[in-house]
Amino acid sequence: PYTTLFRSYYFCRNSTRRFFAREGMVCVAGSWIAISFFGCLPFVFSREIPNFVDALFEIVSGFTTTGSSILGDVEALSPGIMYWRSFSHWLGGMGVLVFLLALSPNGERGKGYTMHLLRAESPGPNVNKLVPKMRTTARILYVIYMVLTFINFLFLLLGKMPVFDAVCTAFGTAGTGGFGIRNDSIAGYSPYIQNVCTVFMFLFGINFSCYYLLLVRHVKEVLKDQELRLYIIIFVVSILLITFNVRGLYGSWEETIRHAAFQVSSIMTTTGFASTDFDLWPGFSKALLLCLMVVGACAGSTAGGLKMGRLLLI
């Protein structure tokens, strides 16, 4: 499926004329259509999802990290298809073209094409250069993305999660998409696994530029980041409000806080994992979760929603 993407990408790359923002938008839109079309073919050819429209819906949901599904029984899928379904989240989380930019060799043909492709593809209101070259910025972003995913995977393994489950869950967490490999999502796993997912969903909702600043020891800049502060404040306050609102539904404070924190982290980052049936929660908690879903997490993260940066502007 990547043949078309690479051809269209290098066609743009080797062009000698100036590359403007609108061309970047067209390349990104065309690439998303192409990869969605080819990405659904494994579902169709394997007969796991024989209907083309259903298969297209499923893979588009994966690449866009939406998380909606037409499947009634996820556990009936073969391991290979289950892996591809989860991997689509990981690819789509940071953006397929950002991935291609990160892999591409250096070169400066087609003035401005790298900058416009990265800005058109990256999540959030804007994307800033971490280093002078935009392609190097793309590589830094993806290295951070891969390292966080791997650390997430290791922590899941420490909780005695099966390797295959840990890989697929790490993909869904990193892309903040929420495709699970169990019908009950994360509810069937141990409290430790749920807590790990809570932490990493929150971490993937932070602007990736903050991680780079931490790596280069610009800690003060991270601490002064208004968007990050707002994200943490809303996250903590929401957990407290929901904890006290649903405290009578669970047997202990630990269980109450765990489910409240998990669902706030999941919904706020638009991941969509579930540790409990929150449809049974009081109206206040469900309304708060709905608001968190709309607001989303930080710009420059893999999360969806309006984004904290835009909320600050409003």
Question: Which residues does each predicted region cover?
Answer:
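Membrane-proximal intracellular helices of multi-pass ion channels
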Residues: 1-314
